[in-house]
Amino acid sequence: MMLIFQIALLVLVLYSLLLVVAVPVLFSSASDWSRAKNVILVGSLLWVLMVIGVGVLSFFK
C-alpha cells in the first residue's frame, strides 16, 4: 500500500508542475478561449480528484 501511495503522490506532484506551466500558457493564448477554458476546468477537476485520492491513500498507509 505504501508503494501505491508514493506513486500517487509522485503523479500528483508531476501533474501539479505541469499545471503550473500549462495554465498561464492557456490564459495567455487568446486564440481559442472556449477550448482553453474547458481544458483548464477539466485539468483542475482532475487535480482536485488526485488530491482527494492521495489523501485517502494517506489515511490507509
Curated annotation (Swiss-Prot):
It is found in: Cellular thylakoid membrane. It comes from the Bacteria. It is a multi-pass membrane protein. GO terms for biological process: photosynthesis; photosystem II stabilization. Keywords: Membrane, Photosynthesis, Photosystem II, Reaction center, Thylakoid, Transmembrane, Transmembrane helix. The chain crosses the membrane at residues 8-28, 41-61. GO terms for cellular component: photosystem II reaction center; plasma membrane-derived thylakoid membrane. InterPro entries: PSII_PsbZ (IPR002644), PSII_PsbZ_sf (IPR036512). Pfam families: Ycf9. The keyword Cell inner membrane does not apply. Its main location: membrane. The keyword Nucleus does not apply. PSII is composed of 1 copy each of membrane proteins PsbA, PsbB, PsbC, PsbD, PsbE, PsbF, PsbH, PsbI, PsbJ, PsbK, PsbL, PsbM, PsbT, PsbX, PsbY, PsbZ, Psb30/Ycf12, peripheral proteins PsbO, CyanoQ (PsbQ), PsbU, PsbV and a large number of cofactors. It forms dimeric complexes. Belongs to the PsbZ family. May control the interaction of photosystem II (PSII) cores with the light-harvesting antenna, regulates electron flow through the 2 photosystem reaction centers. PSII is a light-driven water plastoquinone oxidoreductase, using light energy to abstract electrons from H(2)O, generating a proton gradient subsequently used for ATP formation. This is Photosystem II reaction center protein Z. It comes from Synechococcus sp. (strain JA-3-3Ab) (Cyanobacteria bacterium Yellowstone A-Prime). The lineage of its organism: Bacteria, Bacillati, Cyanobacteriota, Cyanophyceae, Synechococcales.
